[in-house]
């Protein structure tokens, strides 16, 4: 009998699916021990299931320990209630144990993350192997993918005492097993919320320290290969994650993390370090033995420099030259030598074709990470049979492939010369292709992956009725197989079923910035739409019929509300929908579509579906890390008498820099003015020339302009040149505590380091009032000149009634309708995996219905509100509107929380309401607030939506303010700023 423990507590409705996935296994001789508390939401589900299936035994008062003690089966596994067991899993696993007699079997698993499924494999299949022979099985073993003798689960790591987490118990099973099987069959799927991965450094660093210490102690009596495997595959990655949290944690926990590292890590002379990459070795040594300054330097460099390591060929072999080693002390030389783990051969196959029936022509790229392709030999490609025999061997010809730099993400090396072409006789039977490259008397090998694009086969020409086909196998590797005589040519995969298909055959960008797609369809008699779909929004266009069965559609990429990033390409008709399939001409490497407003990249997935990435209009070289690094290092020439302006790192055409730009142009500035934009959808102030962030003209303007004006930080690499002047306008009077004043852990290490470099480079800081000056200087550690005065951006509030009604007309709001502007600040807790989130603690739909007002929702760019779910015309998403000042003029009342917009809107004299339902959490935990906010503020504070609705009804019933703004303070401050800029341009010392 097989016993399956299912941990249902906290899984909610997912628990039923987990239990049913066990009951539906073809292996019928099993019992389910469902661990669930009587008060848990899943208890009722478990009771109902148990009433209909006697194989289920609820364990109402206990935990996994108690359930294992109750198990009647000789074999056991543990399933989390969030997860599911895949069909046929237990038959495959028990069958393997019957054949081998091993104590445990480990299968492959699949992580169902927000970014899509990710397969977690054992290294390869093994039968009755000892753990020291297969230490790679310690790479994050998943409980539900491990089936073992029940006694192993009962005694796993028992000597350590205390409660045991699921990953700890699972590793204990592997350590206790005499022999193990491993399968490449997927047997288990787990998702966010599951207990199988164990505690995370982000959510519970102390628990992860506990786990690491216990695993380290448990492994102390094991053989060196097992201890090394545990360090490489489990403890090392856990300690790296803890190291990344160290600067954000309270001192007591940070010290605990360092002690944990010291207790686990071996001496520098130990060979156990050899399985880790160089920068991980350096980080962990510094964590255990270095100072805080060096630890922060190493952690910061992993983001600022990347985790790529430049390698050069020296007299004694390869030498690692990561720049961070020049900035820290005390790392033993044994840890900085090049190990096998530091040498990774990367291979990409762009396309395959045939020269006759037997010769396969392969085009792709192959390079060793960190090594200049000029320092290596040409790739050697071998066809290898199932028995390991080499069937053919050819030296490839090198060619250029600029795409390799984009894929590599390496700032220190170019792999543009790593392309190859080779023609290899494939032999008669099944074969795989293997690449090898030599460098410094070392040979590195790897199997060639399947070609880019879908998993369709590429058949050879027929000779005497015999053909062969190149295709991707189940592991994503390139293989060649014989086709039986008369076998039909394999069709492209289709996720849409046999009746409805929309096939993409052409793609391009129009001059106007529209993505023009064309193709053919089958099984669709009526019309249909093409859609770009992502978690952040969708773009829709009707497919226009052309000739019979063909269509064309233009998707507008120029709307500022269309976020950049990846989208799936789908079709939708009145009664059906599905994923678009790529046609043969687009099935392969990514198709680059260059535009002037935005660019796009079309990608074919393995299942034949298509994705589109919407990007800034940059070249492939400008998008690559190497290309950017070369632009950073390039000499851009002497300074130019000109002004470079940027708002929110190029995302905006507004705020203080835009008002300063407009003022300079209106007063006839006789110097070039450059405006930084993320892409061509960002509005550019009149009189300025747009430069796209990351482009060569942008680098040149930023590096050569005499005056730089920004309201945010500049890139991390930026360093002001002699003679340049930098005006920091900032972007609001601070309410949220900033930088050095913020709560511990609220500000990332990378941002702290960036600001520590950039704040001393400011020549003038703007502050809206004296309190803002004090808080900004305190938070930033700034000691330079400060100009106190009304913000330039509030020149946008001088438009009065004319602009008010103009904006209302643009938004479709009647002139006399009451209008509420809801403009909350951002919250870290709302950020999802894609950077988006719900973005609101307010039910805008209910607010509009209960107040009779139109609600304008202005979400922060860090927490985009998902407007497609509002379902009411009275709620309008204005997050993408270019000028918040226009929205303030259009509104009768402002609702906000901890946003500096209150100090701007207050100039209109109209009502403001502070809505802070999460005040304690935000003020005391997440961020911290200045000056007794919001209780000490001049505006009413409400904590619930019902209170808010009552206050707003009263405010809207009162006579409306004219909203006129005194122009003098704004214009006077603009004049002072203009004089400062002109003096700076003319080489005078600004006043």
Feature names for model-found ranges:
Residues 76:
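Short aromatic/hydrophobic "clamp" motif used to bind/position activated sugar donors
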Residues 788, 870-873, 900-965:
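Catalytic binding pocket for nucleotide-activated donors in carbohydrate/polymer assembly enzymes
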Residues 247-642, 666:
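Basic, ligand-binding patches in group-transfer machinery
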Residues 1-5, 31, 168:
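Cell-envelope/extracellular polymer assembly enzymes that use nucleotide-activated donors
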Residues 617-629, 733-834, 861, 961:
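A nucleotide-sugar donor-handling region in carbohydrate enzymes
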Residues 84-203, 213:
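Donor-binding/catalytic cores of nucleotide-activated saccharide
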Residues 20-29:
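Short, acidic, metal-binding catalytic loop of nucleotide-sugar glycosyltransferases
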